[in-house]
Protein backbone atom coordinates (compact mmCIF):
# COMPACT_ATOMS: atom_id res chain seq x y z
CA UNK A 1 0.00 0.00 0.00
CA UNK A 2 1.27 3.44 -0.75
CA UNK A 3 0.52 6.55 1.16
CA UNK A 4 -0.17 8.98 -1.70
CA UNK A 5 2.34 11.75 -2.42
CA UNK A 6 2.30 14.05 0.56
CA UNK A 7 0.82 11.36 2.81
CA UNK A 8 3.97 10.48 4.73
CA UNK A 9 3.94 13.68 6.74
CA UNK A 10 5.41 12.14 9.86
CA UNK A 11 8.86 12.67 8.38
CA UNK A 12 10.63 15.75 7.12
CA UNK A 13 9.09 17.42 4.10
CA UNK A 14 12.14 16.90 1.91
CA UNK A 15 12.10 13.21 2.66
CA UNK A 16 8.37 12.90 2.05
CA UNK A 17 8.51 13.62 -1.65
CA UNK A 18 11.40 11.27 -2.23
CA UNK A 19 9.75 8.44 -0.34
CA UNK A 20 6.36 8.97 -1.88
CA UNK A 21 7.81 9.05 -5.36
CA UNK A 22 9.61 5.79 -4.65
CA UNK A 23 6.78 3.70 -3.28
CA UNK A 24 3.33 3.03 -2.01
CA UNK A 25 0.46 5.52 -1.41
CA UNK A 26 -3.26 5.55 -0.69
CA UNK A 27 -6.27 7.08 1.05
CA UNK A 28 -9.80 6.20 2.08
CA UNK A 29 -12.61 6.89 -0.36
CA UNK A 30 -16.38 6.93 0.03
CA UNK A 31 -18.05 3.85 1.58
CA UNK A 32 -20.94 2.25 -0.31
CA UNK A 33 -23.75 -0.15 0.43
CA UNK A 34 -24.44 1.34 3.85
CA UNK A 35 -27.20 -0.47 5.74
CA UNK A 36 -28.12 -0.54 9.41
CA UNK A 37 -25.50 -3.21 10.14
CA UNK A 38 -23.02 -3.27 7.24
CA UNK A 39 -21.07 -1.25 4.69
CA UNK A 40 -18.36 -1.68 2.08
CA UNK A 41 -15.20 0.34 2.70
CA UNK A 42 -13.21 1.68 -0.25
CA UNK A 43 -9.74 3.11 -0.81
CA UNK A 44 -7.36 4.13 -3.55
CA UNK A 45 -3.89 2.60 -3.37
CA UNK A 46 -0.77 1.98 -5.41
CA UNK A 47 2.21 -0.35 -5.18
CA UNK A 48 5.52 -0.66 -7.01
CA UNK A 49 6.37 -4.11 -5.59
CA UNK A 50 9.91 -2.89 -4.94
CA UNK A 51 10.76 -5.57 -2.39
CA UNK A 52 9.59 -8.93 -1.10
CA UNK A 53 10.79 -8.09 2.41
CA UNK A 54 8.08 -5.43 2.82
CA UNK A 55 5.25 -6.54 0.52
CA UNK A 56 2.38 -4.14 -0.16
CA UNK A 57 -0.28 -5.01 2.41
CA UNK A 58 -3.48 -3.14 3.27
CA UNK A 59 -6.55 -3.28 5.50
CA UNK A 60 -9.13 -0.97 7.07
CA UNK A 61 -9.66 0.00 10.67
CA UNK A 62 -12.95 1.38 11.96
CA UNK A 63 -14.84 2.26 15.14
CA UNK A 64 -18.07 3.90 16.34
CA UNK A 65 -17.48 7.54 17.20
CA UNK A 66 -16.68 7.91 20.88
CA UNK A 67 -15.37 4.36 21.32
CA UNK A 68 -11.66 4.17 22.12
CA UNK A 69 -10.90 0.73 20.66
CA UNK A 70 -10.67 -0.02 16.94
CA UNK A 71 -11.69 -2.97 14.81
CA UNK A 72 -9.97 -3.95 11.59
CA UNK A 73 -10.52 -6.03 8.50
CA UNK A 74 -8.21 -8.85 7.50
CA UNK A 75 -4.94 -7.63 5.96
CA UNK A 76 -4.56 -8.36 2.25
CA UNK A 77 -1.14 -8.69 0.64
CA UNK A 78 -0.97 -7.83 -3.05
CA UNK A 79 2.68 -7.20 -3.87
CA UNK A 80 2.28 -6.35 -7.55
CA UNK A 81 3.06 -3.23 -9.54
CA UNK A 82 -0.33 -1.53 -9.92
CA UNK A 83 0.89 0.98 -12.53
CA UNK A 84 -0.86 3.79 -10.69
CA UNK A 85 -3.76 3.90 -8.29
CA UNK A 86 -6.31 1.12 -8.07
CA UNK A 87 -9.39 0.66 -5.92
CA UNK A 88 -9.54 -1.77 -3.04
CA UNK A 89 -12.64 -2.59 -1.03
CA UNK A 90 -13.62 -4.73 1.93
CA UNK A 91 -17.06 -5.32 3.49
CA UNK A 92 -17.68 -4.88 7.20
CA UNK A 93 -20.62 -6.25 9.18
CA UNK A 94 -21.93 -6.27 12.73
CA UNK A 95 -22.41 -2.50 12.83
CA UNK A 96 -24.83 -0.63 15.07
CA UNK A 97 -27.90 1.01 13.51
CA UNK A 98 -28.03 4.82 13.25
CA UNK A 99 -24.43 5.17 14.43
CA UNK A 100 -21.62 7.43 13.28
CA UNK A 101 -18.59 5.35 12.21
CA UNK A 102 -15.09 6.56 11.50
CA UNK A 103 -12.74 4.58 9.28
CA UNK A 104 -9.17 4.66 7.98
CA UNK A 105 -7.23 2.86 5.28
CA UNK A 106 -4.05 1.26 6.64
CA UNK A 107 -1.05 -0.47 5.17
CA UNK A 108 2.63 -0.77 4.48
CA UNK A 109 4.82 -1.69 1.56
CA UNK A 110 7.65 -0.86 -0.81
CA UNK A 111 10.61 1.10 0.54
CA UNK A 112 8.71 4.10 1.88
CA UNK A 113 6.18 2.70 4.38
CA UNK A 114 7.70 0.30 6.86
CA UNK A 115 5.82 -2.14 9.05
CA UNK A 116 3.62 -1.87 11.10
CA UNK A 117 2.41 0.75 8.61
CA UNK A 118 0.34 3.94 8.60
CA UNK A 119 -3.37 4.78 8.49
CA UNK A 120 -5.16 7.62 6.72
CA UNK A 121 -8.71 8.84 6.34
CA UNK A 122 -9.71 11.23 3.58
CA UNK A 123 -7.30 12.33 0.88
CA UNK A 124 -4.63 14.65 2.31
CA UNK A 125 -5.79 13.77 5.82
CA UNK A 126 -3.55 13.39 8.85
CA UNK A 127 -1.83 10.09 9.59
CA UNK A 128 -2.03 7.77 12.56
CA UNK A 129 -0.54 4.43 13.52
CA UNK A 130 -2.46 1.17 13.11
CA UNK A 131 -4.54 0.39 16.18
CA UNK A 132 -4.66 4.03 17.27
CA UNK A 133 -7.11 6.79 16.46
CA UNK A 134 -6.25 10.21 15.03
CA UNK A 135 -7.35 13.48 16.60
CA UNK A 136 -11.10 13.08 17.16
CA UNK A 137 -11.61 16.77 16.36
CA UNK A 138 -10.17 16.41 12.85
CA UNK A 139 -13.10 15.03 10.87
CA UNK A 140 -11.03 14.67 7.70
CA UNK A 141 -8.51 12.40 9.43
CA UNK A 142 -11.12 9.67 8.98
CA UNK A 143 -13.67 8.63 6.41
CA UNK A 144 -17.04 9.04 8.14
CA UNK A 145 -20.45 7.51 7.60
CA UNK A 146 -23.65 6.97 9.53
CA UNK A 147 -25.50 3.67 9.35
CA UNK A 148 -29.20 3.48 8.54
CA UNK A 149 -31.73 3.56 11.36
CA UNK A 150 -35.32 2.35 11.70
CA UNK A 151 -36.61 5.37 9.74
CA UNK A 152 -33.44 6.67 8.09
CA UNK A 153 -31.01 5.64 5.38
CA UNK A 154 -27.23 5.77 5.59
CA UNK A 155 -25.23 8.92 4.90
CA UNK A 156 -21.57 9.43 4.05
CA UNK A 157 -19.16 12.34 4.54
CA UNK A 158 -17.48 13.76 1.41
CA UNK A 159 -15.12 16.19 3.13
CA UNK A 160 -14.70 19.92 3.57
CA UNK A 161 -15.58 22.58 1.01
CA UNK A 162 -12.14 24.18 0.63
CA UNK A 163 -10.58 27.12 -1.10
CA UNK A 164 -6.87 27.31 -1.87
CA UNK A 165 -6.56 29.82 0.98
CA UNK A 166 -8.14 27.42 3.48
CA UNK A 167 -5.12 25.41 4.61
CA UNK A 168 -4.34 23.59 7.84
CA UNK A 169 -1.98 26.40 8.82
CA UNK A 170 -4.36 29.20 7.79
CA UNK A 171 -7.70 27.51 8.39
CA UNK A 172 -10.92 29.35 7.57
CA UNK A 173 -14.11 28.91 9.57
CA UNK A 174 -17.47 30.12 8.21
CA UNK A 175 -21.00 28.86 7.84
CA UNK A 176 -23.75 29.07 5.17
CA UNK A 177 -22.11 27.19 2.28
CA UNK A 178 -24.62 27.87 -0.49
CA UNK A 179 -23.56 27.11 -4.06
CA UNK A 180 -24.80 27.02 -7.63
CA UNK A 181 -23.18 26.52 -11.02
CA UNK A 182 -22.84 29.47 -13.39
CA UNK A 183 -21.23 27.40 -16.16
CA UNK A 184 -20.97 23.68 -16.93
CA UNK A 185 -17.74 23.42 -14.92
CA UNK A 186 -17.65 26.28 -12.41
CA UNK A 187 -19.74 27.31 -9.44
CA UNK A 188 -20.08 30.16 -6.96
CA UNK A 189 -20.04 29.55 -3.20
CA UNK A 190 -21.41 31.95 -0.57
CA UNK A 191 -20.45 31.74 3.09
CA UNK A 192 -21.48 33.53 6.28
CA UNK A 193 -19.49 35.29 9.01
CA UNK A 194 -15.84 34.35 8.50
CA UNK A 195 -12.65 34.05 10.53
CA UNK A 196 -9.21 32.84 9.47
CA UNK A 197 -6.23 31.77 11.51
CA UNK A 198 -3.32 34.07 10.64
CA UNK A 199 -5.81 36.08 8.58
CA UNK A 200 -8.89 38.25 9.12
CA UNK A 201 -10.00 37.98 12.75
CA UNK A 202 -13.68 38.45 11.85
CA UNK A 203 -15.50 39.35 8.65
CA UNK A 204 -19.18 40.05 9.31
CA UNK A 205 -21.65 39.08 6.63
CA UNK A 206 -20.79 37.14 3.49
CA UNK A 207 -17.55 35.96 1.89
CA UNK A 208 -17.41 34.11 -1.42
CA UNK A 209 -15.30 31.78 -3.51
CA UNK A 210 -15.59 30.31 -6.99
CA UNK A 211 -14.04 27.40 -8.79
CA UNK A 212 -14.44 24.04 -10.49
CA UNK A 213 -16.96 21.43 -9.43
CA UNK A 214 -17.11 17.67 -9.96
CA UNK A 215 -20.25 15.68 -9.30
CA UNK A 216 -20.08 13.52 -6.21
CA UNK A 217 -17.03 15.31 -4.78
CA UNK A 218 -16.39 18.13 -2.33
CA UNK A 219 -14.68 21.11 -3.99
CA UNK A 220 -11.11 21.63 -2.82
CA UNK A 221 -9.74 24.22 -5.28
CA UNK A 222 -12.08 27.18 -4.89
CA UNK A 223 -10.55 30.65 -5.21
CA UNK A 224 -11.43 33.38 -2.73
CA UNK A 225 -13.14 36.37 -4.32
CA UNK A 226 -12.19 39.98 -3.54
CA UNK A 227 -14.79 42.55 -2.57
CA UNK A 228 -16.72 43.59 -5.70
CA UNK A 229 -16.13 45.37 -8.00
CA UNK A 230 -12.47 44.33 -7.82
CA UNK A 231 -11.62 41.82 -10.54
CA UNK A 232 -11.18 38.15 -9.56
CA UNK A 233 -7.61 37.44 -8.47
CA UNK A 234 -6.40 33.82 -8.48
CA UNK A 235 -4.26 32.80 -5.55
CA UNK A 236 -5.74 35.07 -2.90
CA UNK A 237 -4.52 34.03 0.55
CA UNK A 238 -7.51 35.29 2.54
CA UNK A 239 -11.26 35.82 2.18
CA UNK A 240 -12.78 39.28 1.78
CA UNK A 241 -16.22 40.81 2.39
CA UNK A 242 -18.47 40.08 -0.57
CA UNK A 243 -22.03 41.37 -0.22
CA UNK A 244 -22.39 45.08 0.61
CA UNK A 245 -22.37 46.04 4.27
CA UNK A 246 -25.89 47.12 5.30
CA UNK A 247 -26.47 50.75 6.15
CA UNK A 248 -29.07 52.33 8.40
CA UNK A 249 -30.16 49.24 10.34
CA UNK A 250 -31.48 49.41 13.90
CA UNK A 251 -30.96 47.20 16.92
CA UNK A 252 -33.94 45.05 18.01
CA UNK A 253 -34.26 46.95 21.29
CA UNK A 254 -36.80 49.29 22.85
CA UNK A 255 -35.88 51.95 22.10
CA UNK A 256 -33.76 50.92 19.10
CA UNK A 257 -30.29 52.25 18.47
CA UNK A 258 -28.09 52.40 15.41
CA UNK A 259 -26.85 48.94 14.48
CA UNK A 260 -23.20 48.67 15.41
CA UNK A 261 -23.83 49.91 18.94
CA UNK A 262 -24.98 47.99 22.03
CA UNK A 263 -23.03 44.82 21.16
CA UNK A 264 -24.46 44.53 17.65
CA UNK A 265 -23.22 44.49 14.08
CA UNK A 266 -24.86 44.73 10.64
CA UNK A 267 -24.59 41.72 8.35
CA UNK A 268 -25.71 40.63 4.89
CA UNK A 269 -26.43 36.90 5.02
CA UNK A 270 -27.25 34.87 1.89
CA UNK A 271 -30.46 32.86 1.63
CA UNK A 272 -29.99 31.44 -1.85
CA UNK A 273 -28.59 31.79 -5.34
CA UNK A 274 -29.33 30.46 -8.81
CA UNK A 275 -28.04 30.84 -12.35
CA UNK A 276 -30.16 33.23 -14.40
CA UNK A 277 -31.40 31.22 -17.41
CA UNK A 278 -29.60 31.86 -20.67
CA UNK A 279 -26.70 33.65 -18.98
CA UNK A 280 -23.65 33.00 -16.83
CA UNK A 281 -24.91 35.51 -14.30
CA UNK A 282 -26.24 34.66 -10.86
CA UNK A 283 -29.21 35.84 -8.85
CA UNK A 284 -28.28 36.15 -5.17
CA UNK A 285 -30.91 36.56 -2.47
CA UNK A 286 -29.87 37.85 0.93
CA UNK A 287 -31.17 39.44 4.08
CA UNK A 288 -29.85 42.48 5.89
CA UNK A 289 -29.79 41.86 9.64
CA UNK A 290 -28.69 43.57 12.80
CA UNK A 291 -27.00 40.81 14.78
CA UNK A 292 -27.44 41.75 18.42
CA UNK A 293 -26.26 40.00 21.57
CA UNK A 294 -29.79 40.33 22.97
CA UNK A 295 -33.13 40.79 21.27
CA UNK A 296 -32.76 38.37 18.38
CA UNK A 297 -31.55 38.80 14.81
CA UNK A 298 -34.49 40.17 12.82
CA UNK A 299 -34.09 40.50 9.05
CA UNK A 300 -34.80 44.15 8.30
CA UNK A 301 -34.53 44.07 4.50
CA UNK A 302 -34.60 41.42 1.77
CA UNK A 303 -32.49 42.07 -1.32
CA UNK A 304 -32.05 40.40 -4.71
CA UNK A 305 -28.89 41.16 -6.69
CA UNK A 306 -27.78 40.18 -10.16
CA UNK A 307 -24.11 39.18 -10.10
CA UNK A 308 -21.61 38.65 -12.93
CA UNK A 309 -18.92 36.10 -11.93
CA UNK A 310 -16.75 36.98 -14.92
CA UNK A 311 -16.21 40.54 -13.69
CA UNK A 312 -17.06 40.11 -9.99
CA UNK A 313 -19.60 42.91 -10.22
CA UNK A 314 -23.15 43.41 -9.02
CA UNK A 315 -25.18 44.36 -12.06
CA UNK A 316 -28.47 45.31 -10.41
CA UNK A 317 -30.00 45.33 -6.94
CA UNK A 318 -33.62 45.18 -5.85
CA UNK A 319 -35.10 45.56 -2.37
CA UNK A 320 -38.63 44.14 -2.46
CA UNK A 321 -39.23 44.09 1.29
CA UNK A 322 -38.32 46.50 4.10
CA UNK A 323 -39.55 45.96 7.66
CA UNK A 324 -41.71 48.66 9.23
CA UNK A 325 -40.45 49.50 11.74
CA UNK A 326 -37.00 48.23 10.84
CA UNK A 327 -36.22 46.80 14.27
CA UNK A 328 -39.35 44.60 14.16
CA UNK A 329 -38.01 42.58 11.25
CA UNK A 330 -39.85 41.17 8.25
CA UNK A 331 -42.73 38.71 8.65
CA UNK A 332 -41.97 35.05 7.93
CA UNK A 333 -43.71 35.17 4.55
CA UNK A 334 -41.18 37.74 3.32
CA UNK A 335 -38.10 35.89 4.59
CA UNK A 336 -37.49 34.28 1.24
CA UNK A 337 -34.61 32.37 -0.33
CA UNK A 338 -33.86 29.34 -2.52
CA UNK A 339 -34.57 31.06 -5.86
CA UNK A 340 -35.78 28.74 -8.63
CA UNK A 341 -36.47 29.95 -12.16
CA UNK A 342 -39.54 28.26 -13.59
CA UNK A 343 -40.13 27.54 -17.25
CA UNK A 344 -43.31 29.64 -17.04
CA UNK A 345 -41.63 33.05 -16.76
CA UNK A 346 -41.75 33.24 -12.98
CA UNK A 347 -39.10 33.27 -10.28
CA UNK A 348 -40.07 31.14 -7.28
CA UNK A 349 -38.72 31.66 -3.78
CA UNK A 350 -39.23 29.56 -0.69
CA UNK A 351 -39.41 30.15 3.05
CA UNK A 352 -40.65 28.63 6.27
CA UNK A 353 -42.08 29.43 9.66
CA UNK A 354 -42.56 27.62 12.96
CA UNK A 355 -45.69 27.40 15.11
CA UNK A 356 -47.63 26.94 12.93
CA UNK A 357 -45.19 24.86 10.88
CA UNK A 358 -45.30 26.05 7.27
CA UNK A 359 -43.07 25.66 4.22
CA UNK A 360 -44.15 28.41 1.84
CA UNK A 361 -43.54 29.47 -1.73
CA UNK A 362 -43.86 32.86 -3.41
CA UNK A 363 -43.48 33.90 -7.02
CA UNK A 364 -42.70 37.03 -8.99
CA UNK A 365 -42.10 37.64 -12.71
CA UNK A 366 -38.53 36.56 -13.55
CA UNK A 367 -37.39 40.06 -14.46
CA UNK A 368 -35.07 42.34 -12.46
CA UNK A 369 -37.53 45.17 -13.03
CA UNK A 370 -40.21 43.09 -11.30
CA UNK A 371 -38.45 41.18 -8.53
CA UNK A 372 -37.26 44.38 -6.84
CA UNK A 373 -40.85 45.48 -6.16
CA UNK A 374 -42.73 43.76 -3.36
CA UNK A 375 -46.07 44.60 -4.96
CA UNK A 376 -45.31 42.08 -7.71
CA UNK A 377 -45.05 39.10 -5.32
CA UNK A 378 -47.77 36.54 -4.71
CA UNK A 379 -47.86 33.63 -2.26
CA UNK A 380 -49.40 30.19 -2.53
CA UNK A 381 -52.23 30.37 -0.04
CA UNK A 382 -55.88 29.82 0.81
CA UNK A 383 -57.51 33.25 1.12
CA UNK A 384 -60.75 32.98 3.04
CA UNK A 385 -59.94 29.30 3.69
CA UNK A 386 -60.82 28.67 0.05
CA UNK A 387 -58.97 26.64 -2.57
CA UNK A 388 -55.19 27.05 -2.86
CA UNK A 389 -54.24 29.83 -5.26
CA UNK A 390 -51.77 32.65 -5.74
CA UNK A 391 -52.62 35.54 -3.44
CA UNK A 392 -51.26 38.85 -2.17
CA UNK A 393 -52.57 38.03 1.32
CA UNK A 394 -49.58 37.19 3.53
CA UNK A 395 -51.87 35.87 6.25
CA UNK A 396 -53.34 33.26 3.91
CA UNK A 397 -50.13 31.37 3.04
CA UNK A 398 -50.46 27.61 3.11
CA UNK A 399 -47.79 24.96 3.54
CA UNK A 400 -46.65 23.01 0.49
CA UNK A 401 -45.59 20.08 2.69
CA UNK A 402 -47.04 18.73 5.92
CA UNK A 403 -46.04 16.64 8.90
CA UNK A 404 -42.63 18.23 9.45
CA UNK A 405 -41.13 20.92 11.67
CA UNK A 406 -39.04 23.01 9.25
CA UNK A 407 -36.07 24.31 11.21
CA UNK A 408 -34.52 25.19 7.86
CA UNK A 409 -35.48 24.71 4.21
CA UNK A 410 -33.41 24.78 1.03
CA UNK A 411 -34.76 24.18 -2.48
CA UNK A 412 -32.97 23.98 -5.83
CA UNK A 413 -33.60 22.88 -9.40
CA UNK A 414 -32.00 19.51 -10.20
CA UNK A 415 -33.18 19.31 -13.80
CA UNK A 416 -30.63 17.27 -15.77
CA UNK A 417 -29.56 15.22 -12.74
CA UNK A 418 -31.15 11.95 -13.79
CA UNK A 419 -34.95 12.04 -13.47
CA UNK A 420 -34.96 14.69 -10.74
CA UNK A 421 -36.47 18.15 -11.00
CA UNK A 422 -37.05 20.12 -7.79
CA UNK A 423 -35.60 18.92 -4.50
CA UNK A 424 -35.91 20.27 -0.98
CA UNK A 425 -33.85 19.44 2.10
CA UNK A 426 -35.59 20.18 5.40
CA UNK A 427 -33.76 20.21 8.73
CA UNK A 428 -36.24 18.48 10.98
CA UNK A 429 -34.86 19.16 14.46
CA UNK A 430 -32.90 21.81 16.31
CA UNK A 431 -29.22 21.27 17.20
CA UNK A 432 -29.32 17.62 16.08
CA UNK A 433 -28.57 15.94 12.79
CA UNK A 434 -31.93 14.98 11.28
CA UNK A 435 -33.20 15.95 7.82
CA UNK A 436 -35.55 14.74 5.11
CA UNK A 437 -35.66 15.18 1.34
CA UNK A 438 -38.75 16.10 -0.67
CA UNK A 439 -39.10 16.16 -4.45
CA UNK A 440 -41.59 17.70 -6.87
CA UNK A 441 -42.00 18.71 -10.49
CA UNK A 442 -43.78 21.98 -9.64
CA UNK A 443 -42.97 24.59 -6.96
CA UNK A 444 -46.44 24.26 -5.46
CA UNK A 445 -46.22 20.47 -5.42
CA UNK A 446 -47.33 17.92 -4.79
CA UNK A 447 -44.12 17.40 -2.83
CA UNK A 448 -43.27 13.76 -2.19
CA UNK A 449 -41.43 12.78 0.98
CA UNK A 450 -38.13 11.10 0.16
CA UNK A 451 -35.41 9.55 2.30
CA UNK A 452 -34.67 10.80 5.80
CA UNK A 453 -31.21 10.74 7.30
CA UNK A 454 -28.80 12.12 9.85
CA UNK A 455 -25.67 13.98 8.79
CA UNK A 456 -22.49 11.94 9.46
CA UNK A 457 -21.40 14.19 12.30
CA UNK A 458 -21.58 14.36 16.09
CA UNK A 459 -23.22 17.81 15.81
CA UNK A 460 -21.72 18.75 19.15
CA UNK A 461 -20.44 22.18 20.09
CA UNK A 462 -21.04 25.74 19.01
CA UNK A 463 -24.35 26.27 20.78
CA UNK A 464 -26.47 25.49 17.71
CA UNK A 465 -25.24 22.02 16.79
CA UNK A 466 -25.22 21.26 13.07
CA UNK A 467 -27.03 23.79 10.88
CA UNK A 468 -26.96 25.44 7.43
CA UNK A 469 -28.32 22.39 5.58
CA UNK A 470 -28.17 23.01 1.83
CA UNK A 471 -28.44 20.89 -1.29
CA UNK A 472 -26.00 21.21 -4.20
CA UNK A 473 -27.46 20.49 -7.61
CA UNK A 474 -24.14 20.84 -9.44
CA UNK A 475 -22.52 18.22 -7.18
CA UNK A 476 -25.38 15.72 -6.98
CA UNK A 477 -25.68 12.63 -9.18
CA UNK A 478 -28.72 10.67 -10.37
CA UNK A 479 -28.40 8.32 -7.38
CA UNK A 480 -26.71 10.52 -4.73
CA UNK A 481 -28.07 13.78 -3.31
CA UNK A 482 -25.14 15.91 -2.17
CA UNK A 483 -25.76 18.24 0.77
CA UNK A 484 -23.73 20.40 3.12
CA UNK A 485 -23.94 21.49 6.72
CA UNK A 486 -21.94 23.53 9.18
CA UNK A 487 -20.03 21.17 11.46
CA UNK A 488 -19.30 22.98 14.75
CA UNK A 489 -16.88 20.35 16.05
CA UNK A 490 -14.64 20.02 13.00
CA UNK A 491 -11.03 21.17 13.21
CA UNK A 492 -11.06 20.85 16.97
CA UNK A 493 -14.14 23.03 17.43
CA UNK A 494 -13.03 25.73 14.97
CA UNK A 495 -15.92 24.66 12.74
CA UNK A 496 -16.28 24.11 9.00
CA UNK A 497 -18.76 23.50 6.20
CA UNK A 498 -18.70 19.81 5.25
CA UNK A 499 -20.43 17.90 2.47
CA UNK A 500 -22.19 14.57 2.51
CA UNK A 501 -24.33 12.33 0.34
CA UNK A 502 -27.49 10.28 0.71
CA UNK A 503 -29.04 7.88 -1.78
CA UNK A 504 -32.20 9.17 -3.47
Question: What do these predicted regions represent?
Answer:
Residues 98-100, 344, 478:
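Extracellular Ig-like/FN3 beta-sandwich strand-entry sites
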Residues 1-25:
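Secretory targeting and sorting signals
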Residues 44-47, 427, 474:
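Solvent-exposed strand-to-loop "edge" motifs in beta-rich extracellular domains
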Residues 24-149:
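Short, surface-exposed linear motifs at loops/turns and structural transition points
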Amino acid sequence: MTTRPGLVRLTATAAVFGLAAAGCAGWSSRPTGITSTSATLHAQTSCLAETTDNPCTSWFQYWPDGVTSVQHTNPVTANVDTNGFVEVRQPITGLRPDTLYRTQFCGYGDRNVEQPGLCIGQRDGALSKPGSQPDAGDYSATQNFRTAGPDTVGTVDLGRALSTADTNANAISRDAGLSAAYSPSRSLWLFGDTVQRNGPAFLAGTTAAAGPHVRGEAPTRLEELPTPPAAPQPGRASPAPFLPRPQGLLTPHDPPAACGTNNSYPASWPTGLAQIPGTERMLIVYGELCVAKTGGWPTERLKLVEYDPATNRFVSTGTPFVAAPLQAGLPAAQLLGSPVFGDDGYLYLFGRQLNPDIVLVARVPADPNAWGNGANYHWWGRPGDGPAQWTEDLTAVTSIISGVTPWSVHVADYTGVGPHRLAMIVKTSFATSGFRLYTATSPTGPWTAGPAGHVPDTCQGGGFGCYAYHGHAELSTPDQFVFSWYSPGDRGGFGHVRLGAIAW
